[in-house]
Amino acid sequence: MNKAIASKILITLGFLFLYRVLAYIPIPGVDLAAIKAFFDSNSNNALGLFNMFSGNAVSRLSIISLGIMPYITSSIIMELLSATFPNLAKMKKERDGMQKYMQIVRYLTILITLIQAVSVSVGLRSISGGANGAIMIDMQVFMIVSAFSMLTGTMLLMWIGEQITQRGVGNGISLIIFAGIVSGIPSAISGTFNLVNTGVINILMLIGIVLIVLATIFAIIYVELAERRIPISYARKVVMQNQNKRIMNYIPIKLNLSGVIPPIFASALLVFPSTILQQATSNKTLQAVADFLSPQGYAYNILMFLLIIFFAYFYSSIVFNSKDIADNLRRNGGYIPGLRPGEGTSSFLNSVASKLTLWGSLYLALISTVPWILVKAMGVPFYFGGTAVLIVVQVAIDTMKKIEAQIYMSKYKTLSAVGF
């Protein structure tokens, strides 16, 4: 490993460390003891799940309590709008247009952050504490302070994510979510053993949980490394005994084309609304809706299943453009044996991608929901879904592949420099 790659890894770790430091900076004017007690008693619902994705920043009411979710939500909205309005889609493909597009995403993130910050501030009044619940200062002052603090925190996370993507290794936003989930693993393990010690769950249940986790990890690794290889040929004339030499190659198409995006998008759409509704303890109707959408309920997991399939198809159509691949092949003198270059190749690739996306979307949806079904059947008293495991393993694999690719690229440049 050369110095450039080592430097990128250190930069990535440095920014992730900064992210974890921010998770310990609380918003001024709140009763942290009341907040902690509230989250201890609500760890099994949407609040607990939202807290997990934020790296326990919510339970500390940190300035990054909203995490990167406002940015993800704004990205979802813009992607859906791009699919609806051709001019917006065209803007994304241009260099200057992409800058304008990202600027719109940032402005939308600011708006969503402010709306969510106000919602959180109002919800804090329902937490047992003083006259204003867990709020220890004037309510109007706190709403301004909390909105500014959370907006600053979310903007900092966006900046950290962009810096990691540009200067570090891997996708910055995915790594932030990865770091948040991983940071909660020690406390989750400790809490599980406490349940064993107190007799809430027995040894057989613990062994069952471990086996489910290991089986989930194995399934994720197996599918994430699976790909369909489409053979292609490049006809090139070479001066070798006056014969043409065909150089064979292939197009790798992953079984899971959409990657980690569908479960992240689905979680973003379900978790925060459920969290806000969970705080509406005074309204019986809203509380009933919150209970209905609890992560431990069937409705939440059915919606998660359906949303993941939708986003898998939607995002696969964005990341895999069969027409562009077919055009690039034709320009470079490549072709798929038995198929006509151009439209015939594009149709074939689109058909293959559609079939793979069907199985890939089902895989994502099942991995995100089946572990919960198994754990619930065992009678375990806490939520365990495969979404967190899926995100952690997928991001780890993707980051390792990018590091490996940069190492190979570095070796190639070294060989080119010495004349090989």
UniProtKB/Swiss-Prot annotation:
The chain crosses the membrane at residues 9-29, 61-81, 104-124, 141-161, 173-193, 203-223, 257-277, 300-320, 355-375, 377-397. It is a multi-pass membrane protein. GO terms for cellular component: cell envelope Sec protein transport complex; plasma membrane. Gene3D superfamilies: SecY subunit domain. Its main location: membrane. One of its GO terms (biological process) is protein transport by the Sec complex. Keywords: Cell inner membrane, Cell membrane, Membrane, Protein transport, Translocation, Transmembrane, Transmembrane helix, Transport. InterPro entries: SecY, SecY/SEC61-alpha, SecY_CS, SecY_dom_sf. It comes from the Bacteria. It is found in: Cell inner membrane. Pfam families: SecY. One of its GO terms (molecular function) is signal sequence binding. The central subunit of the protein translocation channel SecYEG. Consists of two halves formed by TMs 1-5 and 6-10. These two domains form a lateral gate at the front which open onto the bilayer between TMs 2 and 7, and are clamped together by SecE at the back. The channel is closed by both a pore ring composed of hydrophobic SecY resides and a short helix (helix 2A) on the extracellular side of the membrane which forms a plug. The plug probably moves laterally to allow the channel to open. The ring and the pore may move independently. Component of the Sec protein translocase complex. Heterotrimer consisting of SecY, SecE and SecG subunits. The heterotrimers can form oligomers, although 1 heterotrimer is thought to be able to translocate proteins. Interacts with the ribosome. Interacts with SecDF, and other proteins may be involved. Interacts with SecA. Belongs to the SecY/SEC61-alpha family. This is Protein translocase subunit SecY. It comes from Helicobacter pylori (strain ATCC 700392 / 26695).
